């Protein structure tokens, strides 16, 4: 089973994990949340993400879901992926940015897949979960 770590700005990661607990009735096995508070030293953030990755690792890989590309949570997670075996985590790591609830639900539901397949399904789930609701054509407005 692929481990999943949610890394996001405080309190997004915990809120996402709370939603998963609500949807599944329990906190899903091998899923952890790491909230990154403002002004935390990036070394401290990295250490917490690494500990969470160790906690979910079964040898099948770790998928890290982050909220915003280029922000501290994504940068910290990307460092873990870039270090590879040098991090001490003896498993592949994949980082995805743009976390949303459909992405998380897809990940949890398909954790039996391999890491790369799970990452692909997560991206599909996240993209498919972004929809425009309501009328297909914008309502005409009159400007005066």
Which role does the model predict for each range below?
Residues 1-144:
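N-terminal loops that bind phosphate or other acidic moieties
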């Amino acid at each position: 089973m692929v481990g999943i770590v949610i890394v996001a700005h405080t309190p997004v990661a915990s809120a996402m994990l709370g939603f998963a607990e609500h949807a599944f009735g329990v906190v899903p096995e091998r899923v952890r949340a790491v909230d990154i508070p403002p002004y935390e030293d990036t070394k401290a953030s990295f250490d917490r993400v690494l500990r969470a990755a160790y906690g979910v690792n079964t040898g099948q890989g770790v998928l890290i879901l982050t909220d915003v590309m280029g922000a501290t949570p994504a940068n910290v997670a990307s460092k873990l992926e870039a270090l590879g075996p040098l991090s001490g985590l003896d498993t592949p790591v994949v980082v995805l940015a743009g976390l949303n609830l459909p992405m998380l639900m897809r990940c949890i539901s398909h954790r039996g897949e391999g890491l790369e397949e799970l990452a692909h399904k997560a991206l599909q789930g996240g993209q498919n979960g972004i929809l425009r609701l309501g009328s297909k054509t914008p309502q005409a407005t009159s400007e005066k």
